[in-house]
Amino acid sequence: MFSGSIPALATPFRDGAFDEATFRRLVDWQIESGSSALVPCGTTGEASTLSNAEHHRVIEVCIEQAAGRVPVIAGCGSNDTRNALLHMNFSKKAGAAAGLCVAPYYNRPSQAGLIAHFSFLAENSDLPIVLYNVPSRTVTDIEDETVVELVTKYPDRIVAIKDASGDLSRVADHRMGIGRDFCQLSGNDELWLPHSAAGGSGAISVTANVAPALCAEFHSAIAANELARARELNDRLFPLHYAMFSDASPAPVKYALSRVMEEFTDEVRLPIVSASEASRKAVDEALEHAGLI
């Protein structure tokens, strides 16, 4: 379904508003650098502080600018099931290939609640769903048995998972419970290599925002079983993976983008604030280590 280096795009702001022109340039740069799909309005895109109108415009611009060159997996997550469906229906009409749907956060639903939430979305929208499991942010974990139940019940609707649990055993668990062809994407850049070795097909990546060509080359080496080359690229990228989270995300990502894209500002929305001096130092050192500045 999906594979390769898939950036979870940052949303550029200028003077408090969505900077559409810079976002279009970011989309072009990503595609020209080898990114295989794009994810607007995810965690890194500050979806939680976008209005619905802004959220939909970011998705719309991404799809317009991609112009069919790569698929767009639109961020459709919400802790309000009805609002998630609103995002999905808009994204379907706009031309998205799938919707990335995070486990509802703050509400802390049970596994039965998660099944009801994702079942409602699957039954009321034609947009394929990529499950997004990130318990460090949502508290609630989409357990393996829940994933298997959902995919078995809706095989044509729930088509992939982005797993950011950090538990590599889940790749094998999903392969055993669902099948080897089920699309599994890493949500942890630092685990991209072992996740792929276990059976994953790529990553929805934060680091790919600022190092799209390196990340695309890294995944190509993995796919070609060029382990020595993959390790070499992993070594170059590894400090950057951690630097992207050296302060509250996506502040370090936006600072890094401002260093590699002249027109990209490091502006974030409250309650996130700009990256600290220590974080900026870590980002600069990681960018230099990767050969990006």
Curated annotation (Swiss-Prot):
One of its GO terms (molecular function) is 4-hydroxy-tetrahydrodipicolinate synthase activity. It comes from Erythrobacter litoralis (strain HTCC2594). This is 4-hydroxy-tetrahydrodipicolinate synthase. Pathway: Amino-acid biosynthesis; L-lysine biosynthesis via DAP pathway; (S)-tetrahydrodipicolinate from L-aspartate: step 3/4. Its main location: cytoplasm. It catalyses: L-aspartate 4-semialdehyde + pyruvate = (2S,4S)-4-hydroxy-2,3,4,5-tetrahydrodipicolinate + H2O + H(+). Catalyzes the condensation of (S)-aspartate-beta-semialdehyde [(S)-ASA] and pyruvate to 4-hydroxy-tetrahydrodipicolinate (HTPA). It is an enzyme of class 4 (lyase). Its EC number is 4.3.3.7. SMART domains: DHDPS (SM01130). It is found in: Cytoplasm. The record marks 43, 106 as: Part of a proton relay during catalysis. The lineage of its organism: Bacteria, Pseudomonadati, Pseudomonadota, Alphaproteobacteria, Sphingomonadales. Homotetramer; dimer of dimers. GO terms for biological process: diaminopimelate biosynthetic process; lysine biosynthetic process via diaminopimelate.
